[in-house]
């Protein structure tokens, strides 16, 4: 179809992974499995500066998880979540601008928020149990 992007990409951060993933058959066939921002060389026409931002954001995202026991609350307070969410939105605008019309980048990133049980967890990490 005229005007339709050839490649569809899904944008979201995955623990220990990147943020740009295939979203259609053309992307899988021509670009591989992804995450594209971690492949060397990256198959996408993104600047080195943008790729470095992707890497830094992925590392930052990984700090939101409680790596000792992932189902328990992560360490981020709401201000950190808000900063991350804003940075994600800015990065997505940059990526879309650099990739142009051959790519459709679908935002699949869920906003992060402070875990409502964080205070209870921090008060007694060893004895913590979720109520839900």
Each predicted region: which residue ranges?
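Intrinsic low-complexity, intrinsically disordered or marginally ordered coil/linker segments
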Residues: 1-132
């Amino acid at each position: 179809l005229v005007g339709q992007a050839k490649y569809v990409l899904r944008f979201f951060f995955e623990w220990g992974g990147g943020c740009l993933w295939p979203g259609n058959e053309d992307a899988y066939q021509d670009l591989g499995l992804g995450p594209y921002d971690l492949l060397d060389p990256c198959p996408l026409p993104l600047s080195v500066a943008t790729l470095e931002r992707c890497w830094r954001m992925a590392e930052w995202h990984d700090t939101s998880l409680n790596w000792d026991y992932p189902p328990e609350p992560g360490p981020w307070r709401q201000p950190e979540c808000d900063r991350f969410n804003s940075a994600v939105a800015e990065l997505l605008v940059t990526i879309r601008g650099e990739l142009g019309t051959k790519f459709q980048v679908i935002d699949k990133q869920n906003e992060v928020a402070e875990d409502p049980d964080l205070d209870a967890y921090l008060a007694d990490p060893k004895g913590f149990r979720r109520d839900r």
